[in-house]
């Protein structure tokens, strides 16, 4: 009853209840005028061009006529489901169709669709519609690849000065990276008996396995020394004040060592090779003192394996990590920032030269810098835990010197 009252209220003037030819207008709950949803309108349409069927705002050419979305959908459903034989009209099939009355007589609306020229043969059945959608997706993917290839071709590559910088950074990395490309042949696996026993009665397995920790401390000093040697060989680093050099080295040391381990992740054995010589499993590294930091380094190794980084890209990543101007205590922040910008620009141009076929490769690679910075921050906190759990005599002096005073 309430519904009928609302229907009557929508036509306030009694004269408006009749067609121009004197026929009575029929009413339903949809007779209130609704604004069309604003959306994409093709450029070939004039502003507010009307639908040739109902005079609502048209959205484009549909089945050979300029129509609105509503009439397009009505015509498509009618043909696809073969509904028109069942349509009927109570008023001699001569209703006037507009945007207010279009839903009140399906037969007259369909007849008008045909009369204005909408083509039944252009309505696709289900199989053709699926094939068309597939073709559209294939074309869209093809265009995306073409645009990506075109944008890659138009990106700047390194200048002669940048090539020289890249060569020096790569040489610095290769000369300080233990075992080089022969690490798989040279590595030795840490025995399974070390560091893989579950730590019982300790919350979250937070106890440090001293045997595994002792094994790791044997390789930590040469690993740190190689990071220092790498930094000393870098252009611009030696020009910084000694105090800033020390701050930068302490800040990036764990990050660079983690990167060097991560790029030596082996999916077959599920190990990382530390310092180019010791292959360890996730639980061994975790129980040997690193805890959750172990998970972060292994996860990084897994994700980096898809990037197929070469020595130059690893070297430039290390240079970017080293020249981080937000390290606490720096006296020449601006100078360090300019150094990092120089390396970043050369790095980006080198990535353009390499033409990786991974979408958005450069920003994705930069996200790994963020991951490595997080690993460094987590390790600083983890180091405090190791100091509590492990006897002082197990800590090599250089290990203490680099990590003891880091901010947590």
Swiss-Prot record:
Residues given in the record as Zn(2+) 2 binding sites: 89, 95, 105, 108
Keyword Electron transport part of the UniProt annotation: no
Binding annotation for 3,3',5-triiodo-L-thyronine: 226, 275
Tissue expression: A high level expression seen in the gills, intestine and muscles.
Binding site for Zn(2+) 1: 51, 54, 68, 71
InterPro entries for this protein: NHR-like_dom_sf, Nucl_hrmn_rcpt_lig-bd, Nuclear_hormone_rcpt_NR1, Nuclear_hrmn_rcpt, ThyrH_rcpt, Znf_hrmn_rcpt, Znf_NHR/GATA
Pfam families the UniProt entry points to: Hormone_recep, zf-C4
Zinc finger (NR C4-type) stretch: 51-71, 89-113
One biological process term in Gene Ontology: positive regulation of transcription by RNA polymerase II
Coiled-coil ranges (or none): none
Domain NR LBD: 161-405
DNA-binding region per UniProt: 48-125
Family under the similarity heading: Belongs to the nuclear hormone receptor family. NR1 subfamily.
Domain notes: Composed of three domains: a modulating N-terminal domain, a DNA-binding domain and a C-terminal ligand-binding domain.
Name under which the protein is recorded: Thyroid hormone receptor alpha
Organism name: Necturus maculosus (Mudpuppy)
Lineage: Eukaryota, Metazoa, Chordata, Craniata, Vertebrata
Gene (UniProt): THRA
């Amino acid at each position: 009853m309430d519904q009928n009252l609302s229907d009557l209220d929508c036509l306030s003037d009694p004269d408006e209840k009749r067609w121009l030819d004197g026929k009575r207008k029929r009413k339903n709950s949809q007779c209130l005028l609704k604004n069309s949803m604003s959306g994409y309108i093709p450029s070939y349409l004039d502003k507010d061009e009307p639908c040739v069927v109902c005079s609502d705002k048209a959205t484009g050419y549909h089945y050979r006529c300029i129509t609105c979305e509503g009439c397009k959908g009505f015509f498509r459903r009618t043909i696809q489901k073969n509904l028109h034989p069942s349509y009927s009209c109570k008023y001699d099939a001569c209703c006037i169709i507009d945007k207010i009355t279009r839903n009140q007589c399906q037969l007259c609306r369909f007849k008008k669709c045909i009369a204005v020229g909408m083509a039944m043969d252009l309505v696709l059945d289900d199989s053709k519609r699926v094939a068309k959608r597939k073709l559209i997706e294939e074309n869209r993917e093809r265009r995306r690849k073409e645009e990506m290839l075109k944008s890659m071709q138009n990106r700047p590559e390194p200048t002669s000065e940048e090539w020289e910088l890249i060569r020096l950074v790569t040489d610095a990395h290769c000369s300080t990276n233990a075992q080089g490309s022969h690490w798989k042949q040279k590595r030795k696996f840490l025995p399974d008996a070390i560091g893989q026993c579950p730590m019982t009665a300790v919350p979250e397995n937070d106890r440090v396995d001293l045997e595994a920790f002792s094994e790791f401390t044997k390789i930590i000093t040469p690993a740190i020394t190689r990071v220092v040697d790498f930094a000393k060989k870098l252009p611009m680093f030696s020009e910084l004040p000694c105090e800033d050099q020390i701050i930068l080295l302490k800040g990036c040391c764990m990050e660079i060592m983690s990167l060097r381990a991560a790029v030596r992740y082996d999916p077959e054995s599920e190990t990382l090779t530390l310092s180019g010589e010791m292959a360890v499993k996730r639980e061994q590294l975790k129980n040997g003192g690193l805890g959750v930091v172990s998970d972060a380094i292994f996860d990084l190794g897994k994700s980096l394996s898809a990037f197929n980084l070469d020595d130059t890209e690893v070297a430039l990543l290390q240079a970017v990590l080293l020249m981080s101007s937000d390290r606490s205590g720096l006296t020449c922040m601006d100078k360090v920032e300019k150094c990092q910008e120089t390396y970043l620009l050369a790095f980006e141009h080198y990535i353009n030269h390499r033409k990786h076929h991974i979408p958005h490769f450069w920003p994705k690679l930069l996200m790994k810098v963020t991951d490595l910075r997080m690993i460094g921050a987590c390790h600083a906190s983890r180091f405090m835990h190791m100091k509590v759990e492990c006897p002082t005599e197990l800590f090599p002096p250089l290990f203490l010197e680099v990590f003891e005073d880091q901010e947590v």
